[in-house]
From Swiss-Prot:
This is RNA-binding protein KhpA. Its main location: cytoplasm. The gene is khpA. It is found in: Cytoplasm. The keyword Cytoplasm applies. GO terms for cellular component: cytoplasm. Pfam families: KH_KhpA-B. A probable RNA chaperone. Forms a complex with KhpB which binds to cellular RNA and controls its expression. Plays a role in peptidoglycan (PG) homeostasis and cell length regulation. Belongs to the KhpA RNA-binding protein family. Forms a complex with KhpB. InterPro entries: KH_dom-like_a/b, KH_sf_prok-type, KhpA.
């Protein structure tokens, strides 16, 4: 999990900047052999702010995450859970 410290900090910073209920932001890391899944949980009222119109904000966050994770040659996926 140390390998993903920067990615986790980046996602938490971005998400907490967008939501109203910062204390309900939870990020769970599930590590696989070649990929890692980051499960993001936010308040039900803040899910729309994270996804954005037509998924634009979620896509932008995933793009930043992919660029940050490219250094480790592993795939990192972001799942937004309600």
């Amino acid at each position: 999990m140390k390998e993903y410290g920067n990615e986790i900090e980046l996602i938490e910073f971005i998400v907490k900047s967008l939501v109203d209920k910062e204390d309900e932001v939870k990020l769970n890391v599930i590590e696989g052999e070649k990929s890692t899944i980051l499960e993001l949980r936010v308040s039900q009222s803040d899910v729309g702010k994270i996804i954005g119109r037509r998924g634009r904000i979620a896509r932008a966050i995933r793009t930043l995450l992919g660029a940050c994770a490219a250094k480790t040659n592993r795939r990192v996926q972001l799942e937004i859970l309600d």
